[in-house]
Swiss-Prot record:
Residues in Ubiquitin-like domain copies: 354-433, 434-509
Domain notes: The ubiquitin-like domains are essential for its antiviral activity.
Summary of the tissues where the protein is detected: Expressed in most tissues, with the highest levels in primary blood Leukocytes and other hematopoietic system tissues, colon, stomach and to some extent in testis.
MF GO annotations: DNA binding; double-stranded RNA binding; nuclear thyroid hormone receptor binding; nucleotidyltransferase activity; RNA binding
Keyword Ubl conjugation: no
Key word Cytoplasm present: yes
UniProt-recorded name of the protein: 2'-5'-oligoadenylate synthase-like protein
Organism: Homo sapiens (Human)
Described purpose of this protein according to its UniProt entry: Does not have 2'-5'-OAS activity, but can bind double-stranded RNA. Displays antiviral activity against encephalomyocarditis virus (EMCV) and hepatitis C virus (HCV) via an alternative antiviral pathway independent of RNase L.
GO biological process: antiviral innate immune response; defense response to virus; interleukin-27-mediated signaling pathway; negative regulation of viral genome replication; positive regulation of RIG-I signaling pathway; response to virus; type I interferon-mediated signaling pathway
Entry-linked PANTHER family: 2'-5'-OLIGOADENYLATE SYNTHASE-LIKE PROTEIN, 2-5 OLIGOADENYLATE SYNTHETASE
Entry keywords, A to Z: Acetylation, Antiviral defense, Cytoplasm, Immunity, Innate immunity, Nucleus, Repeat, RNA-binding
Amino acid sequence: MALMQELYSTPASRLDSFVAQWLQPHREWKEEVLDAVRTVEEFLRQEHFQGKRGLDQDVRVLKVVKVGSFGNGTVLRSTREVELVAFLSCFHSFQEAAKHHKDVLRLIWKTMWQSQDLLDLGLEDLRMEQRVPDALVFTIQTRGTAEPITVTIVPAYRALGPSLPNSQPPPEVYVSLIKACGGPGNFCPSFSELQRNFVKHRPTKLKSLLRLVKHWYQQYVKARSPRANLPPLYALELLTIYAWEMGTEEDENFMLDEGFTTVMDLLLEYEVICIYWTKYYTLHNAIIEDCVRKQLKKERPIILDPADPTLNVAEGYRWDIVAQRASQCLKQDCCYDNRENPISSWNVKRARDIHLTVEQRGYPDFNLIVNPYEPIRKVKEKIRRTRGYSGLQRLSFQVPGSERQLLSSRCSLAKYGIFSHTHIYLLETIPSEIQVFVKNPDGGSYAYAINPNSFILGLKQQIEDQQGLPKKQQQLEFQGQVLQDWLGLGIYGIQDSDTLILSKKKGEALFPAS
């Protein structure tokens, strides 16, 4: 067998040939592996496991799904690891799956040793591995060449039911996932079909790019840092898909070298990466939206699993090592053309553009498309061009359950964790005015422009005009002190962007609905 050519000594113009010659699996070899794996699948489907310890007496496998590289069609040549997810009849909820996960693994482990078909394939090294979640791992051999294959089995709750494999599940599925309060990724196997299909139904050329990135990662990152806590291959796959979607607008005809260089460039800037999709879950549901918004506020890099909003597949890994290796890769022949010029990369933003809904009292709302990494001063320029304001713009936003925050012109939306559709409030002030926030009993708040020397009564008049609560029924507090109508804001030390608490005076009518 010829020695494999080094990627780093392959010119960029030859990358397509490199993938075809060295990375694309041979059909005969792939079929031989899958033939052995089919024996495992048949065992799982046909065997009835005897349940104990609170499980159903008759535990059956409802469905077996190949996941990972063999499942999504991006397997590399000579890959000997196959992952299977077994959906079981005894799991009726995420909570049950978590409670009985290890019991089921023991049942399968015990029964496998009694299967003559598996023993004929040289079943050995059968063990339970601690993962997220735990899995059953063992080795079998192919029938023809006796090549060893490592197979992983993960039992799972069939949360999606018999729904169409690439359609958006009902929001209730994700609501129950979020309420189950499992650790990140604990219930990912329940969504493995969606994870697989997210990659599987992609153009052939993109799969070539995925193979190239995975080969680089295995040979030049993982192999050289075997003990480091490195990101999973799935994270690299998702990053590559994002680069292709944004860089080519999902064009099936692209230059492989440009795609590869783009992924390396993105890896250099891992600290600002924030990626998510809404293919399978929608942000129109309040519980799902809250879950995703909380994820997007975390430390980057953020690559949310498109099938599981509770899992950031990029969290907690040594991306700095990956970035170092990417920097080295960009200096190699595979990233230079025949004239020794560096290959250009696609223009890929580190986060998707988002919609901002701008609200202002007395004016209809309007929408802007901005990038989270744009400076807020540029957002204000867009507002000025749209509405023609000449005064000082004060922008603020509020997340449910939190205080209203002023958006500083020197920062970006990303600084405030804003990476999805958000409503912001516009207040136009003149130089002598400050902005104050008034928090209602329901937790919502409004922004008001007022001269710091104005009386408290003047602010109450604005509140009455905007919210309908008469001045006489209002009670305002600042830092625990009730504010008197005929004293100025400055007397109380109220400064720009401070928050006042609004309540109803005792014995008054209910607070008007907003």
